[in-house]
């Protein structure tokens, strides 16, 4: 089996899936205490890196995604599949798991 080199540009989500670069989690508390990796909350905010073509409707047409590349989004805490590319964390999830676009 041939090895596949993954990068953001080689990942193309299918259907209504969205590929999101996860924002960095907080390194310390408001009081200045440094947090170990095991105590950090899983981030729920990230930037859309890739978007699928959209959900297929019953008549065969596609429903265009509501988010686009570069949008900053808030998504469900335990949604999707976590993917690590190099030192960056990504999550691949369905568009329905995106709660809001953040400006």
UniProtKB/Swiss-Prot annotation:
SUPFAM superfamilies: GroES-like. InterPro entries: Chaperonin_GroES, Chaperonin_GroES_sf, Chaprnonin_Cpn10_CS, GroES-like_sf. GO terms for biological process: chaperone cofactor-dependent protein refolding. GO terms for molecular function: ATP binding; metal ion binding; protein folding chaperone; protein-folding chaperone binding; unfolded protein binding. Pfam families: Cpn10. GO terms for cellular component: cytoplasm. Transmembrane segments: none annotated. Keywords: Chaperone, Cytoplasm. CDD domains: cpn10. It is found in: Cytoplasm. It comes from the Bacteria. Belongs to the GroES chaperonin family. Together with the chaperonin GroEL, plays an essential role in assisting protein folding. The GroEL-GroES system forms a nano-cage that allows encapsulation of the non-native substrate proteins and provides a physical environment optimized to promote and accelerate protein folding. GroES binds to the apical surface of the GroEL ring, thereby capping the opening of the GroEL channel. Heptamer of 7 subunits arranged in a ring. Interacts with the chaperonin GroEL. This is Co-chaperonin GroES. It comes from Prochlorococcus marinus (strain SARG / CCMP1375 / SS120). The lineage of its organism: Bacteria, Bacillati, Cyanobacteriota, Cyanophyceae, Synechococcales.
């Amino acid at each position: 089996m041939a090895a596949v080199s993954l990068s953001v540009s080689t990942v193309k989500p299918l259907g209504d899936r969205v590929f999101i670069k996860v924002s960095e989690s907080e390194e310390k508390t408001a009081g200045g205490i440094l947090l170990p990796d095991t105590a950090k909350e899983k981030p729920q905010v990230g930037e859309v890196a890739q978007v699928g073509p959209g959900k297929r409707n019953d008549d065969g047409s596609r429903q265009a995604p509501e988010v686009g590349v570069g949008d900053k989004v808030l998504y469900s805490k335990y949604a999707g599949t976590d993917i690590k590319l190099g030192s960056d964390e990504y999550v691949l999830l369905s568009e329905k798991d995106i709660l809001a676009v953040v400006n």
